[in-house]
């Protein structure tokens, strides 16, 4: 993740705006750090509760397994947030050493890719359940979901290797140690030839991260949920608005939470003007914090009427994270047989 590396831009933005306009702008680092600490506290408690419920209080199904790993990726992300917040508060000064610089940022990258891939896997699993029910009944099992989860974690780890290679600490000769990407892979940071090579490597990493970590998964999610919604409507499987709400929530939350981060990464790559960098960084921090903390809550409360929560939190979890009802599954199988 490049958010730690980008805080230098925020500090420079505040200074340059103050010098050019004479009007001091509030330093956003305190607000950003406070948001990260708040997200950490809420995220650890809420995601920890979700993991406990999904693991010990619910039936082991494809949906609950995939949601468990999705929320596990959110939980891992929240554990890194205090270290990011500390770096922001110290003007991007990294005090945790080179090894943790690599470890924390590669871990954030793994959890980012994993969360995106699990959201895609959930949409694909529902696609097969509704459009190919016979195949799903034979092959869509908890064991199948476990293998998918393992493949996702391995893929996310492989795609995060660049952070282990390029992430390093660097002395800026101003009394600060920065944890940032060194795409030059050299101690000669000032060499023009090395900087050109580093720019190309940076661009390749950005394109790969944008395509594999946002655009392609987003298209997969839209395609799957569009086909699922159409099929369920045709076969009269929409007994309530619950499935539709969950689908819409998945698409909207995915786009809103991740688009600002990739926009900011693109602006950093193109060395955009300070103000857009300043604004998109703050927005990216807020939306990513929102994603790790609030997205599971959105799934929960769009899954069933809020009144159910007053009766039983477990019933609410079951209505949200379990597969479609046996009646709906039977109707789908019958429809498939007729076809």
Curated annotation (Swiss-Prot):
It comes from the Eukaryota. Its main location: membrane. It is found in: Cell membrane. Residues 1-30, 87-103, 166-209, 269-283 are extracellular. Glycans are attached at residues 5, 12, 19. InterPro entries: Formyl_rcpt-rel, GPCR_Rhodpsn, GPCR_Rhodpsn_7TM. GO terms for cellular component: plasma membrane. Keywords: Cell membrane, Disulfide bond, G-protein coupled receptor, Glycoprotein, Membrane, Receptor, Transducer, Transmembrane, Transmembrane helix. Pfam families: 7tm_1. Signal peptide: none annotated. One of its GO terms (molecular function) is G protein-coupled receptor activity. The chain crosses the membrane at residues 31-53, 65-86, 104-124, 144-165, 210-230, 247-268, 284-303. It is a multi-pass membrane protein. Expressed predominantly in lung, spleen and testis. Disulfide bonds join 101-179. The keyword Kinase does not apply. Residues 54-64, 125-143, 231-246, 304-339 are cytoplasmic. Belongs to the G-protein coupled receptor 1 family. Orphan receptor; could be a chemoattractant receptor. This is Probable G-protein coupled receptor 33. It comes from Mus musculus (Mouse). The gene is Gpr33.
């Amino acid at each position: 993740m490049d958010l730690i590396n980008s805080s230098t831009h925020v500090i420079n933005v505040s200074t340059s705006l103050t010098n050019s306009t004479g009007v001091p702008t509030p330093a956003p680092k305190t607000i950003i750090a406070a948001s990260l600490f708040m997200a950490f506290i809420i995220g650890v408690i809420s995601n920890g509760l979700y993991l406990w419920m999904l693991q010990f209080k619910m039936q082991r199904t494809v949906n609950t397994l995939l949601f468990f790993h999705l929320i596990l990726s959110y939980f891992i992300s929240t554990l890194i947030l205090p270290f990011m917040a500390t770096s922001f508060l110290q003007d991007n000064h990294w005090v945790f050493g080179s090894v943790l610089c690599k470890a924390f940022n590669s871990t954030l990258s793994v959890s980012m890719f994993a969360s995106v891939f699990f959201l895609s896997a959930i949409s694909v699993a529902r696609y097969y359940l509704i459009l190919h029910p016979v195949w799903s009944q034979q092959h869509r099992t908890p064991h199948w979901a476990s293998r998918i989860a393992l493949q996702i974690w391995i893929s996310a780890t492989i795609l995060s290797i660049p952070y282990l290679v390029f992430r390093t600490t660097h002395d800026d000769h101003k009394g600060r140690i920065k944890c940032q990407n060194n795409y030059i892979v050299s101690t000669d940071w000032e060499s023009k030839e090395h900087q050109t090579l580093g720019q190309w490597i940076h661009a390749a990493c950005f394109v790969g991260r944008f395509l594999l970590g946002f655009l392609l998964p987003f298209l997969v999610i839209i395609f799957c949920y569009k086909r699922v919604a159409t099929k369920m409507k045709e076969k009269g499987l929409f007994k309530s608005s619950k499935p539709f709400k969950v689908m819409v929530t998945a698409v909207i939350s995915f786009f809103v939470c991740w688009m600002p981060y990739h926009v900011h990464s693109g602006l950093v790559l193109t060395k955009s003007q300070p103000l857009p960098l300043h604004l998109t960084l703050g927005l990216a921090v807020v939306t990513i914090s929102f994603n790790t903390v609030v997205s599971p809550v959105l799934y929960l409360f769009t899954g069933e009427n809020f009144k159910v929560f007053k009766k039983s939190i477990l019933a609410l979890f079951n209505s949200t994270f379990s597969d479609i009802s046996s009646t709906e599954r039977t109707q789908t199988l019958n429809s498939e047989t007729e076809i």
